[in-house]
């Protein structure tokens, strides 16, 4: 550790009308400061409206892709389908580094290839070494992994979308 205090942020998640609980993440702002700051600011909503015309905020967005024994993915607050999202730096930003390797419970950037990070993220629910070197790990679940598992176990359609929406009803910094 470099003496930098790692930020902690939270999601309050519900499935349909049922509250699931709180997930707390510790962000690796000492290793990937730009990536961690993007996620932190999208949790607080402090950057206002983005270039898309939508608030730069995860609040109200859903987990649009859930694959059992792999990961849960969210962060598309512009479309809600997995085709959108936007970073606090503009539509996308470059990969910062791949120093941290994927493990169960890590928080990592979803992307469409090299240097295409936006707001979409995923939380791993299984060992995923095949993702190393292609997705930036920028944090980990430190509380509420049981809530992540509830999202992972949601009934999904053929497109891996939960049939009862799993929504981030609140989020912020601790």
UniProtKB/Swiss-Prot annotation:
Report the EC number(s), separated by commas if there are several.
5.2.1.8
* Top-rank lineage group of the source organism: Eukaryota
Q: Does the keyword Ribonucleoprotein apply?
A: no
GO cellular component term, pick one: cytoplasm
Domain (PPIase cyclophilin-type) spans 10-173
| InterPro entries in the record | Cyclophilin-like_dom_sf, Cyclophilin-type_PPIase, Cyclophilin-type_PPIase_CS, Cyclophilin-type_PPIase_dom
Root EC class: isomerase
Biological process (GO), any one: protein folding
* Biological role: PPIases accelerate the folding of proteins. It catalyzes the cis-trans isomerization of proline imidic peptide bonds in oligopeptides.
Q: What is this protein called?
A: Peptidyl-prolyl cis-trans isomerase D, mitochondrial
Native organism is: Dictyostelium discoideum (Social amoeba)
Taxonomy of origin reads: Eukaryota, Amoebozoa, Evosea, Eumycetozoa, Dictyostelia
